[in-house]
Amino acid sequence: MVRGPRNREKLQGYYDLYMKTGQIDPNVNPEIAASWQKSREVNPPTDRIRTDCRLSPETFAARQKLHRDAMMYLKHLTTGLRDFFKEYDISLLLLDDECVVLKSYSMPFYQMTPGEIEGVRVGLEQIGTSSVSMACELQTPFWVFGPEMWIRESHDSDACSA
């Protein structure tokens, strides 16, 4: 879901209110509000992404092999776009149906290099509300603005979409 520009200070205020009191401001997007509630229930960390939900090297290699065609397609598709990704600080990740990062094709995701993030599960249970968890839940691309994300280190981001 593509959404119009949002006021960062207001979004930060909504997030802070929810984190302190559990109260959701009526101006919070309903899908974001529902995701915040689910995030609070599963209680992922709020400070930064953890990589302890990483697949074993053998399991990860098997998943990559299963999705080899998609990985090769994106590799060829993104070859000419790397400068664009770099200029606009865009991350492009290929995830499987369990939100495991199969391949990182561009800029670091949450300041994590491809070697750090590949093989890591990044679903709602692991990182809370994010563009990834929203797209997975709603089965459609979703635009999430910095202060709406569960992980505080992402609050300075302009926006993320998945």
Where does each model-flagged region fall?
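Sensory/regulatory domains in signal-transduction proteins
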Residues: 88, 97-98, 102, 115-162
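Intrinsically disordered, low-complexity terminal regulatory regions
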Residues: 1-122
